[in-house]
Amino acid sequence: MLTRITLPSPAKLNLFLHIVGRRPDGYHELQTLFQFLDYGDELTFTLTPEQPGIRLAEPVPGVPDSDNLVIRAAKALAATTENTLPGVTIHIHKRLPMGGGLGGGSSNAATTLLAMNRLWELNLCEDQLAEIGLRLGADVPVFVRGHAAFGEGVGEKLTPTNPPEDWFVVLKPECNISTGKIFSAEGLTRDTPKIKIRPAFEGDASRYRNDCEDVVRKLYPEVNQSLEWLSQFGPARLTGTGACIFGRFPTESAARIIWESKPSGITGFVAKGVNHSPLHKKLTELK
């Protein structure tokens, strides 16, 4: 029986994000293109039969354990069985910024669902895990599925796609963005015409955009300044509601040249876009 497992929890980018309408329940209808990065957090799960319960090895600063998506994911999974389950201690090695639009919390939740499904030998299928994930957050299912995808609805209706696996410079301006503030903004575009799946990743990338970007640029000058700087070298875009932005480059060396010249005070990283999640690659190796 497997008692310990260490797994990656990759970042995602929204290569574009269009808001195509608003539902009666107030949620926005989206069309977006998700792609993973070969960069992210790392989670270690250790079963503790002698110590029941679900716990973090160390608290995440600023996030109560009861609100942490890792704890919530493990508890949601445990609720699917009446069997007595061994306890687990979870160590989170964070590299992704919180609230950056990179899906860090959602990715952590998905990694937890897949890891604990295996450690607890629950044998739930991917569809069941994605359904649990959706209750935790709209971005969790794409991490559970593990393939780049065209997302619709609130982002949960997924069609696998294979956009080019380019290199990215990802920058994190020094500000924290409220997603609720962006989606409730008066000037937010909410009527972008729907596109079909095939054109979602073909042709000129500048034809597509992030509908949140104009509002974010107006409300957060730090993001605007970073986008202006990165746009000197090619199309630059917001991911999610930010604050992270990204620029696409054909090679690692081209990306690193730009990275080395970034303004002081801005954090971030260089990473490769990948269509098959590093999490799922690792799980396949462990079979």
From Swiss-Prot:
Pathway(s) it belongs to: Isoprenoid biosynthesis; isopentenyl diphosphate biosynthesis via DXP pathway; isopentenyl diphosphate from 1-deoxy-D-xylulose 5-phosphate: step 3/6
Name of the coding gene: ispE
Gene3D superfamilies found in the cross-reference section: 3.30.230.10, GHMP kinase, C-terminal domain
Binding site for ATP: P97, M98, G99, G100, G101, L102, G103, G104, G105, S106, S107
Function recorded in the entry: Catalyzes the phosphorylation of the position 2 hydroxy group of 4-diphosphocytidyl-2C-methyl-D-erythritol.
Coiled coil: none
HAMAP family: IspE (MF_00061)
Name of protein: 4-diphosphocytidyl-2-C-methyl-D-erythritol kinase
